Every structure is written in structure tokens, then in C-alpha cells.
């Protein structure tokens, strides 16, 4: 249960009921809309919740807000609710103070729901796909892939905890120009092995990394010089397949090491081989969205994007300045472009597989493609405007001792995901990369391996381990944590106890907001606050040496905190160490 929402709902109901009673007595006019806005004030010294209803409704009632507030408070019946008092503040705020029943219900909810505590049903019945990483399979994964990987994975978790049926997908770009370039790069290195580096020119736009040399060496070890006599087309096809067959399993292995497993690795080539790309181009043509020029098939991208920008509220004179141009779908040589494949892929997501919502995690450098793709899906009649969402993530810088790090100490090459995981614990990588997507981030390599409270991962996991140690000590002494119905939770009335319970109650709301904003870093920040609230409680509230009833209530609160920390760590894909 979302206890924050339950409290807000009660205040809304109390306000509506008081208003109706006042109307019946002729004290307030009828016909005023009663949808009270209820918030948690920044300063809770005067109350735990507040509503501005009296301020908002006073004009329609033709009364002073404080007069409205006075009338409503006289008609509010708090018996049986979560609240012990309601007070008028300032120009007409109504401030409500929580009673012990709410605090007890939070702890009871955690005990009852256990591993499911925090789960909601706001997206129940909705079929979501999160497509992320989708790194080029022609080489090692980089820091952008590392960030996109954890953002996509934790966003999928947040959506799952919000009730959605979630599908994680990796789109494998195994078709087109980059694969041809990949094959030519391996081919050139293969020829150089046989004829010498100076005898064979390497393609200027080829892939220059050592990984290509290693693939060429492996290909030569397996096939010798036999491919000198093959046709270029045979060499390119076989070398590309050879390279992909080695790179893709390595990518899967690195991602699984990173804690990421996909429901499907979807291959771009399957869309071309099945004719689905050609069929999608035909459908766009039938709908009037293409034309032929210079023996190529063009899509009316400028018109499509103009429609998209208008939907975003942009004015035509501003759109004109963007210099929008149409794009080629099928080249004069008969080959389809990457855009054609991408449109077909997203048509497949909606039309063939029936996803209600598709979320793509992209680097911010792809921002220009957003309106183009959403508009193309609109053009197909599949409502890309509302069903396709793109999360754009900013750049990552690796920093050590205040200096930007570009090369791996171990390999001397640009740092790959695999290199990073060799140096930094997976938990730290996942936590630090799960930063707010639209902010550029500096990944502090030194901080990530520190074992003190400056490292947020350590700080959170230490809170979890501390509770485990406490409960083990209690068990070793022959005591157990009582069930909530066997304990007097009203004894949890101290400042630090109630602050901790309020933080436990926030968990469901944090998940809801993370899903709403496509920002799983809400959970990072929440766990830091929860760990801090626990450490303050632990330092202020003794358990050993206290009377049994007080000790039992505090043990229950500690156990509830461990449960919520565990659930949050599960969402983030982090481990739960019982000792540190």
C-alpha cells in the first residue's frame, strides 16, 4: 500500500466531507469543485501534510480563505483517521498532523508485503518495451553503453515494480554500411598478415582498433590463406559473420557480468531478410509519404518532422530555421538505408508485437533523430507521438584525482566496459552510472572504490549490513523479532523513529515518480536518505538495555528498514552484503 497516497486520500475525503456538511448548513455555497491539492510541506514543524484548498476555493465561494478554513475545520471529524489534529496556518493553509496509527500501519505494511513492498499497480496491464544499449557489434562497448545499460535496466525494473509487463531488448545492428566496413577492416588486416602491413592499404574509414587485428589473426589461424582465392563478396560475408559470432557472445558476457540480461537480442538483418523493411517502405508509399527522385525512394521527412515539432508547440517560423530535409529510404542501388530499417523495427514493436509503450535509451547526440522516428511511426498510423518515448542521456567522463581518464591502465587503450568492470566493482558501476539521464556526469573512479561513508554505495550497503548484524546478535542471544501484532508500535514516537518510518513510507511514491519521469535515479537518492535516516535512528535509539516492549518495537523498525533497503537494492540490481 502507498501510505503517502493513503494519507493524501484521507485529507481529500475529509475536506470534501466537511465542505458538504458546511453546504448543508448554509455556511458555504454549493457548486464549488472539491479536488483538494494535498502536499507534504518542506517544513513539517507545523504539520505533516497541508492542503491549499481554502486558498484555491475562496474566490468561487466569495469568502476570505481563513474564513473558509475556519468553517471546514469545525466540520472535520478526525476520529478513525490517520490524523490527530488539523490547524489553520498563514493565509488559509490547512495543516494536518499524523497520529500513531499511520506510523504503525507503515511498519505493518512492510512486514506484510515483504519482498513486494513498494510494488504498485499504476501500469498494470500495460505492455512496455525498454530497448537499450543496442551497441554496434563491430567492437567493444564504451562508457556510453555502460551508462545506457544501467539506465535501461533499472528503468525496466522501476516500470516492473509499477505494475507493467516489461520486455528488455537489445537491437543488433548486423546489417548495412557499418557491417560492410567491419568486414573490409578484417579483410585488410587479414591481407596484411599474409602480405605485410606496408603492402596492403587499410581503409581510411575502417575500424582501427586492436580488436580488429585480433579477429583477423583468429580468422587466419582457422582458415590460413584459403580466402585469398575467394570472391570479395564471399570474404566480406564470411568475415563479417566470423567477427559477429565472436563479438556478440562477448557483449552478452560483459553485460551479464554487469548484471544485465535481455529478453531478446533482435537482429536488424531479420527485418531485411523477411522483407519487412521493403513492406514498410511500400506501406509508407501507399499512405502517400514517399516519392522517387534520382532513382531513389525518399520519405517526406521534412513534412513528418514539421508535424512533430508543431505537436511540441513550436511555431512554423522557428521550424523553418531548422532546415528540415527529406531522407532516402531506398538508395538508387536498391539497398535500404538505416532509417528504413529503424522505421520497420519500430513498426514491428507496435504492429506485430503489440507493445503499448516503447522506450528507447539513446545518447544525446541522437536528439535529431527523435522527431524523425516518432513522426514516421505517426505516418504509419501507430501513434508514435504518444507510444514511443526516447530517453536521451548525456555524456560520461571518467575522472581520477580530478583528472579526466581516457585510457585503461591495463591495456593502454580506450576504456571499454570490460576494462571498467576489471577495475571497479559492479555495484559501484551500476549505482554511479544510474545518474539523472539528462545531466552530464563525472564518474569518480577513486570514490567508487572507497570503503567509507563518502561512497554512497558503501553507505547504503553498510546500513543494510549493520541491520543484519544487529538482528544476528539478537538471534544469537535467543531473541527473535516479534510480529507487528505482538508489539506496541505506539512506542515508536521519538523524532528519529518517526523520521525513519516516514522515509519507509516514501518508497512507493519514489518508485511511482521514477516510472513517471523515466528517471530511476530517484531510487539512488531515496536509498541514501533511507540509509541516513537509519544511521541516525541507530545512533539515537538504543535497543540493548531498553525495556522489552521498547526494544521489540525498535527491532521491528530495524527489520522493516532492512526489508525496504533490500527491495531498493533489488531494483538497482545491487548486492545485499550481510557483512562488511
Report each predicted region and the residues it spans.
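Non-catalytic interaction-recognition regions
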Residues: 2-104, 111, 115, 119-580
